[in-house]
């Protein structure tokens, strides 16, 4: 009887431990706020948001932004 109680206790401890580990290692999905690459699931933090691939503005988008400001 003592062996069965110990096994159940160990099983419950393992379940509790797994529930504690999962939330601490969760990564952030694409489009959510981030501060560095390690926070994102795709390891790409671009200008405060998780994204893949990291999109850099080209000449066309810079030109459109220039005309929007005028």
Swiss-Prot record:
What does the record say about tissue specificity?
A: Expressed by the venom duct.
PTM text: Contains 4 disulfide bonds.
Propeptide positions, renumbered to this chain? Answer: 61-70
Residues with the 4-carboxyglutamate modification: 30, 35, 44
Q: Which UniProt keywords apply?
A: Amidation, Cleavage on pair of basic residues, Disulfide bond, Gamma-carboxyglutamic acid, Hydroxylation, Ion channel impairing toxin, Neurotoxin, Potassium channel impairing toxin, Secreted, Signal, Toxin
Q: Which GO terms describe its cellular component?
A: extracellular region
- Please provide, alphabetically and separated by semicolons, the GO molecular function terms listed in this UniProt record: potassium channel regulator activity; toxin activity
Q: Which Pfam families match?
A: Conotoxin_I2
Q: Where are the transmembrane segments?
A: none
Top-level taxon of origin: Eukaryota
Signal peptide extent: 1-26
In which broad location class does this protein mainly occur, judging by the first location in its UniProt entry? secreted
Residues where 4-hydroxyproline is found: 53
- Location relative to the cell: Secreted
Here the disulfide bonds are: 27-41, 34-46, 40-50, 45-54
UniProt record similarity statement: Belongs to the conotoxin I2 superfamily.
As for what it does, the entry says:
Modulator of potassium channels, specifically up-modulates the calcium and voltage-gated BK channels, has no effect on single channel conductance, but increases the open probability of BK channels.
Domain note: The cysteine framework is XI (C-C-CC-CC-C-C).
- The protein here is known as Kappa-conotoxin BtX
